[in-house]
Amino acid sequence: MFRLPIVKFFSRILNRATITIVLVALQVLWLLWAFWAFTTGRVWLNGLLKALSIVIVLYLVRKDENSAYKIGWIVLIGLLPLLGGALYLAFGNKAPAKGLRTRMRKVEQAHTADLTPRPDQTDTLDRVEKNLSHYVETYGPYPAWKHTAAHYFPCGEAMYPRLLEDLERAEKFIFLEFFIVKSGTMWDGIEAILKRKAAEGVDVRLIYDDFGSLLGLPSDFVIRMERSHIRCIPFNPVVPLVSLVMNHRDHRKIVVIDGNVAYTGGVNLADEYINAEQRFGYWKDAAIRLEGAAVWNFTVIFLNCWNAFRPQETDYAPFAPTHLPESSDGVVQPYTDSPLDEEPLAETVYLNILAQAQRYVYIYTPYLAVGEEMLDALKTAAKRGVDVRLVLPGIPDKKLVFRLSRSYYVPLLRAGVRIYEYTPGFLHAKCYVSDDHLAVVGSINMDYRSLFLHFECGALLYSNSQVIALREDVLATLPQCREVQLSDCRTSLPGTLLDSVLRLLSPLL
């Protein structure tokens, strides 16, 4: 009579997420024990580990690497001279695993011709905009496009019904790529449509990050989806007892429907993103819908990732847009950034906007953990007289990172940057808007992981009507925020020391 409750209990606790967490914890404990056991009483081994740490420090000094990242590791090695060098060898390499890097580069190089720039698409841009567009198409390489309609959504629950409508209209294919997919109201609504469309013969594919979705999906998720003819790729699977490194996650949020419609932004496929579940107060996010020529960039981004792991297409032409808006609303340039190369594309786009701004730059970001170059760019823009405003969460999802974000407030405020905290809840949007003619909406946080370690995406809008829509959203959000003053930033000596340590180690958090 107790069999069913017992089965339910064990099935609940013995899921993949629980097993993974337990195995990782055991692995960490085992490594610490092994380190203690092997070094105790072995003077020669202690000396060898210290020598390794010195060599790693010298290597970092010479390495062409982000300075904040190098300093963070040098500080950690200095604090832990016995363990620091070994920790860097285990966790410090920014480059993705060789297999992952080789697969993705091979596919991207094979399809470079699919992204050939067309000068006529940028002939309406001014010199500054053309320079930025040229940079993204050269180092992305993702060209800019006219003949694209855009619609900005100031929250996830505004986007969700429109997304469902577009999914219902799909006739040829649906591509989805997300960091988080979690069972619940939002995913249930999408899944029902995907299953129905797959049964009708629509090509339905899903890429989701295995680490990001670890706690939100059942262990048999892929099997269930494949049985419904929804093909899946769990990106960079988490394998405990093989690697503890959780870097190089697929943080992108992309939907492509029939090659004609695309979505991106900060919204994942989980209930908190549409406020069907309250976690940290009201969840403020942002997304954008594109229709027309620029959708092609997102189609290629998705297919490159898909074919790196499940080779299928050599010709992307059947997935090209078949419908273009009659009128052109500015220029749109979707792009992606990845750790596959040494080009910090996402950071450079943000830096360029700050450097070229004349009147204002308004920024949404859930986290602020940046290097000196980004910090100086924010301060310099404000010192030039540009109205620089940062909007961050009032209720954090990660308290340590929230404290780290606040540790940047004093130098920014002294330079003239205005900082706001969104008091109704958690702000998860990642947007830049400047001078009524330039904006970015995407998945890219202002932290080290987004800017250097993860696969990210965004859409640059040049002189598009939705630039104004984003500006108006920021201005409507500011009255709901608390503006931070210098007097709010007083802290105790221990607090100041903690903030300094967090700043030094910020690239590692």
What are these regions, as identified by a protein language model?
Residues 1-348, 352, 356, 396, ...:
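N-terminal localization/anchoring segments of enzymes in phospholipid and broader phosphate metabolism
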Residues 376, 402-406:
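Short glycine/threonine-rich loop-to-helix capping motif typified by GTGT followed
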Residues 360:
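Phosphate-/nucleic-acid-contacting segments
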Residues 430:
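Catalytic-core elements of nucleic-acid end-processing and repair enzymes
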Residues 418:
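Surface segments flanking catalytic/ligand-binding clefts of nucleic-acid enzymes
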Residues 367-389, 393, 398:
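Helical hairpin unit composed of two closely spaced alpha helices linked by a short loop
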Residues 364-365, 422, 441-442:
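Thr-Gly-centered strand-to-loop micro-motif
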